[in-house]
Design a protein with these regions (language model features):
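A short, GP-enriched loop/loop-strand-helix hinge that lies immediately N-terminal to
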Residues: 1-24, 36-44
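Peripheral (often C-terminal) accessory segments that flank ATP-dependent C-N-forming ligase machineries
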Residues: 222-311
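Alpha-helix N-cap recognition
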Residues: 47, 78-82, 257, 294
Length: 311
């Protein structure tokens, strides 16, 4: 949409010259800092000596991600100097296209929604991914995340500040943050929130559907209202529920078979889609999306959906 605005001189949103801050993680960090939001320490370099010095400063492990990329694709975790050196030997000058970050032990919390022409949220919600996206993508953890019924005041404050700093006008937004699981002197206390990445688009996968199920709304209709009228002309959240997503892999055996799980949770399930092979390796072949009024019921579903038979 930035290219279209540039080509036709449409002044209601982002143009091509401004897009870099939404594409490169290293640039995103500076805008988070502009908003007063702390981030993990980072560096971009093709010099292995500089990378080693960075690792010595922040401690192991160290994370490397494509500076211009989405999701967990191309993400590496280095536990020691040998692994870091091997990466730089393999990548050569291309290593400068990666951003190195200190490791953060945290769950991902988001600020998702639609912003108006003043970079203020018309509607916002949040989803939580307790496990590392990298571990999910590499098959070490099952796919599991959920939309929360409320946004914490701290997260809302940071999300709104980030929208202003990035100039996120008249668009969908999907802002990612870490919420620390454990204290770390350089980062903060358990529960503190750090800026991670921004995406000026709807959240991926079935997340928009989950936001709709959780709130009883139509987020794409709200976006269309924003484009046409500058504000929502249709109902915002009618209720505040949890909506979760669990993923199963076909090659694994689960304690509760598929059909039995569908029957047990038929009143709560919103959808049970099969994923194409290109997505199944990371997310699971079979997804279950369900809504609940309280967290205890949602966690019971999580256990039933993901519990595996002992081999």
């Amino acid at each position: 949409d930035a290219r279209l605005r540039t080509d036709f001189n449409i002044t209601t949103g982002i143009k091509s010259a401004e897009i870099e801050k939404f594409k490169r993680k290293s640039v995103m960090k500076t805008y988070y800092q502009k908003a007063g939001i702390p981030t993990a320490r980072w560096c971009v370099t093709a010099d292995v000596t500089e990378a080693q010095a960075f690792a010595k400063t922040v401690g192991w492990p160290v994370i490397a991600k494509p500076d211009n990329g989405v999701g967990a694709n191309g993400t590496h975790k280095f536990k020691n100097k040998t692994e870091l050196n091997k990466f730089f030997q393999q990548e050569g000058p291309n290593a400068a296209n990666y951003i190195l970050e200190e490791f953060v032990d945290g769950e991902i919390v988001t600020f998702d929604g639609v912003a108006d022409a003043n970079a203020e949220p018309i509607y916002a919600a949040s989803h939580v991914t307790p496990d590392s996206i990298m571990e999910i993508a590499h098959g070490k953890k099952p796919m599991w995340y959920y939309v929360a019924p409320e946004i914490s005041p701290e997260l809302r404050k940071m999300g709104e500040a980030a929208l202003k700093a990035f100039g996120a006008k008249s668009r969908f937004f999907h802002l990612e943050f870490f919420r620390l699981k454990t204290a770390k002197p350089s980062l903060g206390n358990a529960g503190d929130i750090l800026g991670l990445e921004v995406n000026m688009r709807p959240a991926g996968g079935y997340t928009v559907d989950m936001l709709n199920y959780a709130g009883g709304l139509d987020l794409y209709q709200i976006w269309a209202d924003m484009v046409a009228f500058g504000a929502a002309h249709h109902p915002l959240a009618r209720y505040h529920r949890y909506c979760c997503c669990a993923g199963r892999h076909d090659e694994l055996r689960y304690r509760i078979p598929h059909e039995e799980l569908l029957k047990k949770y038929r009143s709560c399930l919103n959808a049970a889609p099969r994923l194409p092979e290109v997505l199944a390796r990371e997310m699971g072949d079979q997804l279950y999306i369900a809504s609940f009024e309280d967290e205890a019921a949602m966690q019971a579903f999580r256990r039933d959906a993901l519990a595996r038979l002992r081999e």
